[in-house]
Amino acid sequence: MITRRKYYEKLQPTKDAHKVYIVCEGKGTEPDYFAFFEGLSSNLEVVVIPPEDGSDPMKLKALAESKFFGDDSKFRIDYQAHDTLWFVIDTDSWEREGKISPLRRFCSSINSEGAEAWKKYSEVKPYSVCNVAQSNPSFEIWLYYHFFEDRPVAEDVESHPSFKEYVNSVISGGFDFQRDPARLEAAIANSKANFIVDEASSPDLYSTEVYRLGEEILGFVNKNLERLRNKM
């Protein structure tokens, strides 16, 4: 099997590298996916922060508060480097339970505070520091769009015990985290083409906002990713 590890050694990020902090609700799939992009560019550092005390959006919010803004904070947003913080979440029952809206409000407050910080750096243009990348029903819809241009057919999905099992069944051999993330550009195009929001402006079924995070990553790794695809 031809993999990224075989053809491309990790590059060490420079001191001033742009950092993308990704707080995700999964401990396996999401970290495995984003690990692919670590070291693909010396100008980008991908930092995945898995859940520690639960995966619901409020627990992830508390985790970010402690990691970035607590007394013993571990990470720091560098506005001059345009660092960003992303929450990668599933819709699950969180929407119904009202746990996603507070997370989006949290990001809005961080972005408002960031506007004040930008004033310290006249050369830094305002940008969206904190972002939510919600997938409906789950992160697996993002994996699905690496291979398919059209939305899933509801009847086909319903014939499987779960959406995750459906995606595993339609991708031959299942999603390979050592090579399939190289299809990032296709995933962005396909998910954007099929992106729909509901009446509450949240991603509708089979829609994902992860393409926005994908676009940010692609901006740094595109050239090396193209070379990697050609070798794979």
Language model features with spans:
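Phosphate-binding/switch region of NTP-binding enzymes
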Residues: 25
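Eukaryotic endosomal/vacuolar membrane-trafficking regulators centered on PX-domain-mediated PI3P pathways
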Residues: 56-66
